[in-house]
Amino acid sequence: VTAGESFGTIAVKYGITVDALIIANPTVNPNAIPVGTVLSIPAAPAEGDSASVLPTPIPVTLQAPACYQDTAWRIICFLDSSNPSATPIEGVSATLRYLSADGTLKEAVAYSLLNRIPAGGTLPLYAVFPADKTWNGSMDAELRSAIPSLAVSSTVEVSGTAIELNAEGTSARVTGKITAGDAGAGEYWVLLVGRNGQGKITTARRFSVNLPAGETSVEFAFQVYSLSGMIETVDVLAEPAP
């Protein structure tokens, strides 16, 4: 288990259910998995049983993908995923597809940039396609997975946020403070999501912040850069790292 992984994200990664992963690891607490834990990964269902690999996802509202090409012609995509339910969810992913110039259907899986989406919350998903100079800009999205959150999340608050844009509006420096509910909670993730005037995601990046021992708050300062066009606003989200 590496930093940032949960039973939900690991299950999605290996194409198995969370229940199967829990049964295969009866001595591991899914709500508190130490980094470095070695898990037993059960075999995925045989070919032909793919429909039963992932549980039916909890309803999630997906927005149209915002996709850009970098200097290497890779296709980088973001899309908002919103949780309409009254409880947190995790393991959210979507399958992105487009038809290439040669008639081949290209697919990539977009994963959430934080583990959990709180009740009523919105979180971007992220995917990268290999280089394709002939891509015509089209992209479809289909919900792939979303499960109830098994994690017990400690309280975290973001305050004192200040956003400074450069003259061109193509980069943003964001400062603020993370306040934890419990001292010594350790590592936190801070996600910055830049948007243009229409609310379209132009950049998103996750950073790590380490809370000093015995302290309940820590200040942060991070920079993000637009993949295309101007940044008008920046969402600042945070959660404890697993």
What residues fall within each predicted segment?
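Primarily a LysM-type cell-wall glycan-binding module
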Residues: 1-17, 82
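Acidic (E/D-rich), amphipathic helical modules within compact regulatory domains
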Residues: 12-39, 106-147
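Asparagine-centered strand-capping/turn motif at beta-strand->loop junctions
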Residues: 25, 81-86, 178-182
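Terminal connector regions
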Residues: 48-68, 126-173, 203-204, 210, ...
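Short, solvent-exposed loop/turn segments enriched in Ser/Thr/Gly
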Residues: 72-78, 170-174
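Short acidic/proline- and small/hydrophobic-mixed sequence motifs that coincide with surface turns
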Residues: 87-91, 106, 183-187, 201-202
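Hydrophobic beta-strand segments
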Residues: 94-97, 110-111, 188-193, 207
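Intrinsically disordered, low-complexity Pro/Gly/Ser/Thr-rich segments with frequent PxxP/GP/PP motifs
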Residues: 105-134, 201-229
